[in-house]
Structure formats: structure tokens, C-alpha cells
């Protein structure tokens, strides 16, 4: 409690019966550490090795004397067998919320902490949340690299294609078996037939990657092992094998995330790496002031892998304050590297003049604490996506996991229509993404749906499989809110991305240029090296400015629908010229 004490953990030489106060008498597990209440200036020194329990420190430092947790250089293996397991509702990941999830690092109700590594590699085994922050404040992670010994995505390279068969080389990390003439992927606590979702990667084309649905294994009639990680696959007709390509295999059941940040603030990742993330990457939910600075979301150099994330890399749902992603490498995601949005809840009832019953509509997002008293909400037309009233929450009552009753300070509007929705507008963040590089990406680059200022500057997008930037807003499909009011896309380089490269596509069914969904979007001084002729598509925007850009096409590469206040000027077109 008094602080200033140093504790030592060494799983190879330690003993939990030791005092843990000297390097020569360390503890062997995290159990004694987890039993402490750490204070200002306390430090925990951890040596490499294998752990079977969660690191779960408690206590509080101060801004001047934070708690320090230091990992020495080396390999750390975290196994889920004795880990803390929690039932969690995680945005966009809720296919199985009632099975408790194992957690490797849990920072809960803790303040002012510095976690540092020095060439430190953290390997998790099985489906585990690598790092969770729950009601944490002022925590900085530095110098840690996270990975899996057995990733949740399996890979093989097509070595040769001949008449009636193909020879493939399976990545050594992708353990497998051949059972009853079928190939089965074997993980730590899971197995898969490899037919849920496949992606194909072409290393000779800058790692360009695209989705293939169920993939080629469904067309294989027989499998024959020809070496430790070499398999000959027989077919009557080639189901899509091309020599030199890498095929990636994963399931689509969303039951985990690599990281989870809930009701936390001032969390910083600096000089870290995520070489593989299971599930939805790092999901930040109703948290604020989050920074990712010089973080590599990419396969470990020299590993031979092409995948670093099972789905999104960074997912922000219902956050506020300032989100900063700077100088990050984002390579090898199976979904969007960055997604920022709120959640529309459908109005399903009005039991009293000051009350409304709301429902989570998407099957992968529910059970979340979406409102607290004092939050401001907007009533939104599901057809036009236009807000028509605001109010303030005074009370919240959960009605199971999928419905919530909120009481409001003022009477509800009289003109609510069936299927209209509500957005919590207190929890909307500003976003800055600078000097990042996106590659080996089958989906969009960045999805941005927030009314606070957005700056996308000096990034490189290389051959994204879908639009490099998507600004959406919808109340009928994913129910991801909301409108943008101040977006600057400046100084970026887009190289042969799928088109439209910048796609402003709200899902409003009633379209009126006098009633736009989005406002004030500036696309300035960017370079568009296009594969075709469509750089920008914009729907339902008031105040769209496209100036100073370089387009590698002589056609006008801007398409607008129901927009007003459009300025397209001073752009340079043709043969890759730069403005």
C-alpha cells in the first residue's frame, strides 16, 4: 500500500512460497502479484517462461509515480487452463457471449500503470483475449509483441498445379490432419474443415488479397500427405488453385477478440506489435482517449505468414474523446483495419410519455451498456437517417440482453415512426489517423462514422480489396451509426485500391439533397493511382470539397448522388500526375 516496492516473478526458477522481493527468491506465478494491492512506485519484474494464469494486478499509482510492470526480453507463453474467464458482450463479436472467455492480461479498476517490454514476445495459446482493460485509466503499453503459436487462421501456398491435382505447402504453424480423406485444421482447443471463409493472396502482386467464399477445398476429392507439411490435393476439375498463391482459411463464428477495452480512458499502445490477433482484433467499447503510436499490426517478419488478424484490427464502438492512430503498419487483416462507429438501437415501444423501449438489432452486437444517465440521444428516421429530436437519459433498465428501457428528461417526440432508431451522441469520438500504411487487406481500409472531427492524413493504402475509405451510417443492416460533420482526407496515397476508392455511402432509403446525411467532407491533395476510373463516390453530402488531388485517369473520377455544395477544382488528371 505504501508503494515503492519491487516484486519479482520467474516461472522457471521461482516459488510462490518465496517472499518475491529479490531476484534470487522470485515467485513462479502471478498468483502472489494478483493478491497485492499495488501502490505508487511499485514495480513488478517478470522473467520469460510459461504461465497458466492471468496477470491481473490491482491498485493505483499516481501520474508522477505509476505502477510499473516490466517484462524482460524473451518469450512468454500464456495458456488458458487456469486463466480468469469472463462472460463478455463485445461489439460485433457476440456470437457466443455466454461462454466465458479466457484473458491473459486483465487490467480492471486500475489507474496509472506502465507496462513495458524489451524485445518481449507474448504468445497466447487457444482462444484468449490477449489484453483487457475494464474501467482502467492512464495505462501505457510499450515494447510488447503479441502473437499466437498456432494462429486461428490457417495458410498454405500452392506450389504446383498439374492435371488432376495440386501440390501445396502448408505453413508449419498451421497444424492439420487428414481424416477420412478430408483435410482438417487442428488448433489449440478448436478444429475446422476450412470451408467457412477463404481468402486468396498473391505475393507477386504486393500481397493483394481477396475473399473466395468457401474456397477450393470443397472441390478436392482426395488428400495425400507427401511430406511433413506437404499435401497433394486431387480433383476432377481445378477448383481454383493457382501456383504461387497463398490460401487463407478461417471460421466465421465470432466468439473472441484479441483485445477488449471497456469503460476505460487514456490507454496508450506505443512501439508494440500484434503479429496475430484472434477474433475481432482490439475492440474498444464506450472508452475514451485511446492512442496507438508506432504499432505494427502485421505478421512477424520472416514468419512466412500473410495474415495478422482474424477480422478487424482496431474496432471502436461507442467511444468518445480522442482516438489517435499514428505511424502504424496495418498488413494482413481479414476485415477492416480500422472501424469507428456508434450503434443505432431500434425503437420498439413507448410505455410512457418519457420512456422508450429500444432493441439491439444486429445479432453480433447486444448486451452492451449502451446508455447511462446523463447521455444525450438523438431520434433518427430509419428511412432518411436524419435526426428529428434530442433528449437526455435519466434512467436505464435492461430488459434482458437485447432490449433496454430508457427514461428521458423530456417527453418523447410525437412523430416517431415504426423502425426509427436512437443513437447515443454523447459517445462519439474525434479521430486522427496519420502516417499509417494499409496492405494485404481484403476489405475496406478505414470505416468512419462519427460526428466529431476526423483527420485522415499522409497514409498509404495499397490495393485494398474494397474501398480504402468508407463513410457509411445505417439503420437497417449493421445498425452502425452515425453522420459525419467534419472530415478531412488529406495528403494520402491510394494505390490500385478497389473502387470507388473513397466511398461515402449512407444507407438512407429516402434521398433528398436538401436533407443530407453527411456534411463538410474535404478530400484534398491526395494521390489516386487508380485501377479504373472511380476515385470518389458520394451520396447525400452537403459540402463536399475535392481539390488539389492527382488522379491517374483523364475521366472525371468523382460521382455524386443527392449532394449539394459540391466543389471540384484544381485537381490534376491523367497518367499518374501529381498535383
Spans of features found by a protein language model:
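Surface-exposed loop/turn segments connecting beta-strands in extracellular beta-rich domains
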Residues: 53-54, 78-79, 110, 118, ...
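Ser/Thr/Gly-rich low-complexity blocks that favor extended beta-strand/coil architectures
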Residues: 122-124, 148, 173-225, 366-403
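The right-handed parallel beta-helix/beta-solenoid scaffold, focusing on the short coil/turn
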Residues: 5, 42, 53, 65-67, ...
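Small/polar beta-strand repeat architecture
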Residues: 210-255, 387-431, 439
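Acidic Gly/Asp/Thr-rich repetitive segments characteristic of extracellular carbohydrate-active
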Residues: 11-68, 103-104
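Short glycine/acidic-rich loop motifs that flank beta-strands on beta-rich extracellular proteins
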Residues: 51-56, 80-81, 124-130, 150-154, ...
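Extracellular beta-strand-rich solenoid/capping regions of secreted or surface-exposed proteins
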Residues: 36, 51-70, 77-114, 123-142, ...
Amino acid at each position: 500500500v505504501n508503494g515503492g516496492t519491487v516484486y519479482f516473478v520467474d516461472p522457471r526458477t521461482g516459488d510462490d512460497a518465496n517472499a518475491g522481493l529479490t531476484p534470487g527468491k522470485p515467485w513462479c506465478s502471478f498468483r502472489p502479484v494478483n493478491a497485492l494491492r499495488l501502490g505508487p512506485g511499485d514495480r513488478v519484474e517478470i522473467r520469460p517462461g510459461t504461465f497458466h494464469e492471468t496477470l491481473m494486478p490491482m491498485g493505483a499509482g499516481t501520474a508522477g509515480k505509476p505502477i510499473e510492470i516490466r517484462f524482460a526480453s524473451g518469450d512468454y507463453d500464456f495458456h488458458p487452463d487456469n486463466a480468469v474467464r469472463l462472460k463478455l458482450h463485445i461489439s460485433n463479436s457476440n456470437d457466443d457471449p455466454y461462454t466465458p472467455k479466457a484473458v491473459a492480461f486483465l487490467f480492471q479498476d486500475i489507474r496509472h500503470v506502465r507496462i513495458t517490454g524489451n524485445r518481449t514476445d507474448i504468445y497466447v495459446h487457444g482462444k484468449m483475449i490477449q489484453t483487457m482493460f475494464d474501467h482502467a485509466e492512464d495505462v501505457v503499453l510499450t515494447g510488447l509483441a503479441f502473437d499466437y503459436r498456432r494462429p486461428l487462421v490457417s495458410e498454405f501456398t500452392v506450389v504446383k498445379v498439374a492435371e488432376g491435382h495440386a501440390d501445396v505447402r502448408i505453413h508449419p504453424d498451421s497444424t492439420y490432419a487428414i481424416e477420412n480423406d478430408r483435410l482438417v485444421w487442428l488448433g489449440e482447443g478448436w478444429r475446422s474443415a476450412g470451408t467457412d471463409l477463404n481468402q486468396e493472396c498473391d505475393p507477386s502482386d504486393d500481397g493483394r488479397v481477396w475473399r473466395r467464399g468457401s474456397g477450393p477445398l470443397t472441390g478436392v476429392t482426395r488428400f495425400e500427405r507427401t511430406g511433413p507439411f506437404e499435401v497433394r490435393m486431387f480433383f476432377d476439375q481445378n477448383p481454383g488453385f493457382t501456383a504461387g498463391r497463398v490460401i487463407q482459411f478461417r471460421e466465421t463464428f465470432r466468439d473472441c477478440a484479441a483485445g477488449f477495452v471497456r469503460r476505460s480512458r487514456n490507454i496508450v499502445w506505443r512501439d508494440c506489435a500484434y503479429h496475430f490477433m484472434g477474433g475481432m482484433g482490439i475492440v474498444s467499447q464506450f472508452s475514451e482517449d485511446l492512442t496507438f503510436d508506432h504499432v505494427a499490426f502485421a505478421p512477424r517478419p520472416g514468419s512466412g505468414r500473410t495474415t495478422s488478424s482474424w477480422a478487424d484490427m482496431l474496432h471502436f464502438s461507442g467511444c468518445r474523446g480522442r482516438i489517435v492512430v499514428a505511424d502504424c503498419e496495418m498488413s494482413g487483416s481479414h476485415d477492416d483495419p480500422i472501424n469507428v462507429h456508434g450503434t443505432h438501437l431500434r425503437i420498439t415501444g413507448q410505455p410512457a410519455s418519457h420512456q422508450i423501449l429500444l432493441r439491439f438489432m444486429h445479432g453480433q452486437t447486444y448486451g452492451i451498456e449502451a446508455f447511462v444517465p446523463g447521455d444525450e440521444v438523438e431520434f433518427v428516421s430509419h428511412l432518411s437517417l436524419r435526426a428529428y429530436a434530442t433528449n437526455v437519459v435519466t434512467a436505464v433498465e435492461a430488459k434482458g440482453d437485447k432490449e433496454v428501457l430508457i427514461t428521458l428528461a423530456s417527453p418523447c417526440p410525437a412523430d416517431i415512426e415504426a423502425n426509427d432508431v436512437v443513437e447515443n451522441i454523447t459517445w462519439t469520438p474525434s479521430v486522427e489517423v496519420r502516417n499509417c500504411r494499409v496492405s494485404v487487406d481484403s476489405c475496406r481500409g478505414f470505416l468512419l462514422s462519427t460526428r466529431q472531427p476526423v483527420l485522415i492524413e499522409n497514409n498509404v493504402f495499397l490495393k485494398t480489396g474494397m474501398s480504402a475509405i468508407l463513410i457509411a451510417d445505417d439503420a437497417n443492416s449493421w445498425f452502425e451509426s452515425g453522420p459525419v460533420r467534419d472530415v478531412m482526407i488529406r495528403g494520402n496515397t491510394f494505390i490500385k485500391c478497389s473502387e470507388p476508392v473513397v466511398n461515402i455511402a449512407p444507407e438512407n432509403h429516402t434521398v433528398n439533397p436538401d436533407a443530407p446525411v453527411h456534411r463538410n467532407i474535404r478530400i484534398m491533395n491526395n494521390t489516386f493511382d487508380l485501377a479504373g476510373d472511380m476515385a470518389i463516390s458520394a451520396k447525400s453530402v452537403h459540402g463536399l470539397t475535392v481539390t488539389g488531388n492527382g488522379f491517374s485517369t483523364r475521366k472525371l473520377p468523382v460521382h455524386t448522388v443527392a449532394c449539394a455544395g459540391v466543389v471540384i477544382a484544381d485537381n490534376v488528371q491523367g497518367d499518374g500526375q501529381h498535383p
